[in-house]
Amino acid sequence: MYRNWRDLISPKKLQVESETLTNKYGKFYAEPFERGFGTTLGNSLRRVLLSSLQGAGITSVRIKGVLHEFSSIPGVTEDVTNIILNLKGVSLKMYGTEPKTVRIIHKGDGIITAGDIITDPQVEILNPEHHIATCSKDANLEMEMVVKVGKGYVPADRNRDEKAPVGTIPIDALFSPIRKVNFTVSNARVGQMTDYDKLTLEVWTNGSVIPEDAVAFAAKILKEQLSIFINFDEEAEPSGEAEVGEGESPINENLYRSVDELELSVRSANCLKNAGIKLIGELVSRTEAEMLKTQNFGRKSLNEIKDILAEMGLTLGMKLEGFPDPEVMRRLRGERKDEE
């Protein structure tokens, strides 16, 4: 079976711009990707971040003395419609999954903000300074709001509860903890080649989830959704080990052979020599990206080496513990002298 996915260049880790990182903003870099993968993955992550992450939001409100959203409240500057608009801007974090009821009770003049919402330990207000209403000395405002966990945008009609008390007004809810996502794709260099992609991803949240976790959740969602398209069991990576006689350590003697025995082209052989690679084990320990960074080492040389290693049951990027083993080196040298 062709191992198409192993022949592609991919990043080894996600880099974070620590200087600008906060609980609400993060800037991330990943490189190198094969040409086109930066846009493919950047767009996919952006769409999932904006649409599919769970968050908390207010789904309905009941105001004492109010039967519908087109009413006004004595002593309150804002009408009910404007109060509902302001409630949509309240950012919350829930530590459970069950719906919760929160309240506002206010008498007399003053400005009501999200910090005035009475909650229990399961609900946290993330923007307590957010404006909700302005009251005069004659005001007597009592409100009950239902907070739920959900994802994406849910219109008021879907938040309607037939069992709710009379006067309950369903409202649109934006559950997503993500406020904004940007991504850009620029050129990345691997060795002498500059036609790879560098993905830069910027994420803004409401503070209920940190940007690093948001990106991780989005990637996990994509991974789960794509898994159904894989119709085979992936083969285990070659370990570079082979069983030998009883009482001996399992080794693959090819790892201790000189790279000169690979009979590479002059260009490839010189590149390995300049990189200080003497043994095949040292070669297979290098990743494709590391090899392409070697001076004058290009895709043609890479493919040549990969083909020869494949014939030996080896690949680039292998993890070899305890290599080289001095005891094995001495034993193999002794065997070769005996053969001579």
UniProtKB/Swiss-Prot annotation:
GO biological-process terms attached to the record? DNA-templated transcription
From the UniProt record, which GO molecular function terms apply?
A: DNA binding; DNA-directed RNA polymerase activity; protein dimerization activity
Instruction: Tell whether Glycoprotein is among the UniProt keywords.
Output: no
SMART domains assigned: RPOLD
InterPro entries the UniProt entry points to: DNA-dir_RNA_pol_insert, DNA-dir_RNA_pol_RpoA/D/Rpb3, DNA-dir_RpoA, RBP11-like, RNAP_asu_C, RNApol_insert_sf
The record's EC number reads: 2.7.7.6
The annotated region (Alpha N-terminal domain (alpha-NTD)) lies at: 1-233
Pfam families for the chain: RNA_pol_A_bac, RNA_pol_A_CTD, RNA_pol_L
Q: Does the keyword Glycosyltransferase apply?
A: no
Q: Which reactions fall under this protein's catalytic activity? A: RNA(n) + a ribonucleoside 5'-triphosphate = RNA(n+1) + diphosphate
Q: Which domain of life is it from?
A: Bacteria
The signal peptide stretch is: none
Q: Where is this region: Alpha C-terminal domain (alpha-CTD)?
A: 251-340
An example Gene Ontology cellular component term from the record?
DNA-directed RNA polymerase complex
Q: Which UniProt keywords apply?
A: DNA-directed RNA polymerase, Nucleotidyltransferase, Transcription, Transferase
Q: What family classification does the UniProt entry report for this protein?
A: Belongs to the RNA polymerase alpha chain family.
**What is the documented function of this protein?**
DNA-dependent RNA polymerase catalyzes the transcription of DNA into RNA using the four ribonucleoside triphosphates as substrates.
Subunit relationships = Homodimer. The RNAP catalytic core consists of 2 alpha, 1 beta, 1 beta' and 1 omega subunit. When a sigma factor is associated with the core the holoenzyme is formed, which can initiate transcription.
Question: What NCBIfam families does this protein's entry cite?
Answer: PRK05182.1-2 (NF003513), PRK05182.2-1 (NF003515), PRK05182.2-5 (NF003519), rpoA (TIGR02027)
In the record's own words, the domains note is: The N-terminal domain is essential for RNAP assembly and basal transcription, whereas the C-terminal domain is involved in interaction with transcriptional regulators and with upstream promoter elements.
Stated name of the protein: DNA-directed RNA polymerase subunit alpha
Q: Which gene encodes it?
A: rpoA
